[in-house]
């Protein structure tokens, strides 16, 4: 509005000035001689008009400045006081809510969370370890499952058979050792060396088997691959694979020496530091009628050894001593374990060689069995334990040599033999294993 007033006043003054100029020109025409007077008058009037215009301009500019200042003041004052009130209320409410939650959060929730973490941390560590072991076991099982579990038999080169017609024989799981009910046992023949046949897997089930199912139908192959998913793949010679793992009705024969192997004896006349602590046995020799007292000492772990092996083998005593001396000692040994010796062989059953001594011929053991039961005279299931190599010189491949024992209380030879004898009871021919003590000679083929 002030600007409009300024422009209107300015226009009005200019119009007035034009009218004055027109009148002055008319007066000059009318009043020629008085030209100077009129000029003075016009100049005077012009100056007055200019001064008025300047005053009006200054007044309008000052008025505009005042209006601008008033407008700025109005803008500085908030238009909506209600919005400010709502903002203040929200801030106050948030502050009050934070104050209300401060004590419960830092005094109840935070301590409970820290206690929960402390109690559950060991459980979480155990859980992670279990998961890690499970993953590792799964990976190992997967790698084992990728291995082909099959068995191959090599027949004579003259036979020509079709691999598709090969019969697959399976062996059920063993109750002991590392054959479990969850293992798959696969035994497969392969007529061509190096060829791969598709193995037939039979899941082992814990059920009762007949003798015909437990025994292998064919044992003519020279070597066989036998294994389980957990055991892997192993190459065994033919005669090391048992005819039936569970068929333990027919026990092998374990022939044991007496003196220096199971016991040590000393006559009463000899001076020995421990002679008075041994078991006293009176021996009467029939021919001369002389009675002699002997102090008998058992080898360490003798009773435990006889108790264990009596469950696995038929025990036989074979000694180079006289019958009159051996029988009282054997009777005393039999009173120390639940079983007994099935046979007793003495010096009269040995073979005497000049310059060598008494030799124990194991064929007498098989001959007595053959006469009683009509079985073969092979020594594939006979083991002899002796401390003298001369005693088993005729059957070296059937022998297990132990150190001769006299009085060492820390001796553990009998105890160390138990795991080996437990495994040997499953072998088809004990000579294939015991002959390995000869080294490379055991692999020489005539």
From Swiss-Prot:
PROSITE patterns membership: FCP1
Coiled coil: none
Bias-annotated ranges (Basic and acidic residues): 56-75
Transmembrane portions of the chain: 87-103
Membrane topology value: Single-pass membrane protein
Gene disruption: observed consequences: Leads to inefficient mitochondrial sequestration and degradation, as well as to defective reticulophagy and pexophagy.
Chain intervals for the UniProt region annotation (Disordered): 53-80, 132-168
GO CC entries: endoplasmic reticulum; endoplasmic reticulum membrane; lipid droplet; membrane; mitochondrion; Nem1-Spo7 phosphatase complex; nuclear membrane
E.C. designation(s): 3.1.3.16
GO process annotations (BP): lipid droplet formation; negative regulation of phospholipid biosynthetic process; nuclear envelope organization; positive regulation of lipid biosynthetic process; regulation of phospholipid biosynthetic process
Family note: Belongs to the Dullard family.
Biological role stated in the UniProt entry: Catalytic component of the NEM1-SPO7 complex which acts as a phosphatase and dephosphorylates the phosphatidic acid phosphohydrolase PAH1. Essential for the formation of a spherical nucleus and meiotic division. The NEM1-SPOo7 protein phosphatase is required for efficient mitophagy under prolonged respiration, as well as for reticulophagy and pexophagy.
Protein name: Nuclear envelope morphology protein 1
Annotated source species: Saccharomyces cerevisiae (strain ATCC 204508 / S288c) (Baker's yeast)
